Amino acid sequence: MTHSKRNTRKLRGHVSHGHGRVGKHRKHPGGRGMAGPEHHHRINVFKYHPGHIGKHGMRHFHLMRNQYYCPSINLSKLWSLVTEEERQKAQTDKSKVILIDVVKHGYYKVLGKGLLPEVPLVVKAKLFTPTAEKRIKQVGGACVLRAQ
């Protein structure tokens, strides 16, 4: 709330406004922003922002950030990728085999945890664990390796 007893009201008409000689208390005396962290702001930066200045470690020029990206799915969750209609067809008609392309659903690797129903199926994936491969073949299915 404005009122007449504020200092700014009292100092109207006085050139320096209580900041000494003309030209003082203007602009950016310490520089703008993070200017001078190794010079005139050294103590503050070293105290409150340790590690801000200098190089740390080495650069990896040919770094592949997604090198180890390999989302996996267990055998127990494999049937959740199949629609209910396809499941019913596979249960009734034994001549039809279900094809599950795991990569289309966003997974790369099939792990061997869990059991499969006694329905043959073909699974396409980039990688299979030995137990997953064994259990899929026990049911009468097949494992197909897929490149991309």
Swiss-Prot record:
The keyword RNA-binding is assigned to this record: no
SUPFAM superfamilies documented for this protein: Ribosomal proteins L15p and L18e
Q: Where is this region: Disordered?
A: 1-38
Set out the biological process GO terms recorded for this chain's protein: translation
GO molecular function term, any single one? structural constituent of ribosome
Protein keywords: Ribonucleoprotein, Ribosomal protein
Q: Which domain of life is it from?
A: Eukaryota
* Annotated InterPro entries: Ribosomal_uL15, Ribosomal_uL15/eL18, Ribosomal_uL15/eL18_sf, Ribosomal_uL15_CS
> Which GO cellular component terms, listed alphabetically, does the Swiss-Prot or TrEMBL entry include?
cytosolic large ribosomal subunit
The record's listing under Pfam families reads: Ribosomal_L27A
**Is-annotated flag, keyword Ribosomal protein?**
yes
Ranges of Basic residues composition bias in the record:
1-30
- PANTHER family in alphabetical order: 60S RIBOSOMAL PROTEIN L27A, LARGE RIBOSOMAL SUBUNIT PROTEIN UL15
Q: Which HAMAP family match?
A: Ribosomal_uL15 (MF_01341)
| Family per record | Belongs to the universal ribosomal protein uL15 family.
What this protein is called in its record is Large ribosomal subunit protein uL15
Q: What is the species of this protein?
A: Euplotes crassus
